[in-house]
């Protein structure tokens, strides 16, 4: 179980209203007690952007988060609690205020070669793959390739010296104590064809680059963890994930949420068969990074139209599937936030510790929008309250933590009877049956065994097991 952590919004350790490394260190027990085994730390490098994905210095910590000593203390505390920590590295591009880019604009070598300058007027016709937007930005009269907009000019990996520079970046952060990396925009390293003058993914070249970078890291730290962000179809995801060892399963995240939100057992069965079968075809080469939400997506409760019982059902389905789960900060509280491609602060809102929105450690860099004070989603309002969303969420996490064998199971079959979905798993404990009731009415389980409830209500009625609506149970055989 990994916890995706956005420092700015999490916990303030010095009273300036901005989350930081000291604050995160103070809340490591909170993360560990949730049942987490690792932390995915969003970018902490110097950056003018609130999200941190446009970097001005790959070797420096954003001073709002602290310094190198603070980072070492945070990592020491995490490792003391047996929490691994991976750093999110956006290596595809920089900020236009990065020293490399400023020197490139001045024509200084080798920096000029580290960015792609316009070489033909025909290139200006190139458009972005997903929305047909312009990919060239003008900086003081010079056109530079910037796929993600003028705030993020792309690095040009045609330059061998840039490859060496990136290796130095990786070496530095490993030496500080990180256990690995989440690589942002992994398929975008080579995504413009100089020969054709168009945007075109060059997957074989990208994979060659990542092979060299991951090999470099593993030579330093053999147990280094890598997670790739490749938002694409199954075939492409497989290609990249086999290099990194863990690949995010985006199709599963999207399809699972849609099926649960619509209370559609037929869609859930289809999603699980389609998205998990793809994973098992490549099981020998990588592990599925399972998740429901992240910083680029609408939060879980919002995707369930505010229905927290549906959100908990989606979580239970996810955490009973094979793979390595990643959970986004604040989801344990039921925080809300709707994704906007051009303004995603809403799903990066401050983690709400106190019901009135104020108190020691509460971050205040952004006014609370969806999660207004007195909304009932704060840690203070829910902690220790039986039946609260937080306590139910935590119980589901505890179930997964207490059953690590689920991570390496194989799905033998998936079936449905009305609103009840049954999944047959095979793992180190033998065979197991999972039952998920996607409907509102009770469902009778066809079993002579003794299932155990994971979430919701399971009762023995008239000699048979009855699973309440939006509830889940498991029956382990041959243990």
Question: Where do the protein language model's features map onto the residues?
Answer:
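Short glycine/proline- and charge-enriched loop/turn segments
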Residues: 52-61, 196-198, 245-255, 344-349
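Loop/helix patches that line or flank the sugar-binding groove of alpha-linked glycan CAZymes
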Residues: 214, 218-220, 231-232, 241-243, ...
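Beta-strand-rich binding/interaction modules
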Residues: 441-458
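Acidic/aromatic-lined carbohydrate-recognition and catalytic surfaces
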Residues: 1-167, 171, 175, 188-237
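Core domains of carbohydrate- and sulfate-ester-processing enzymes
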Residues: 102-144, 262-281, 348-375
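A structural motif
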Residues: 36, 178, 186, 323-324
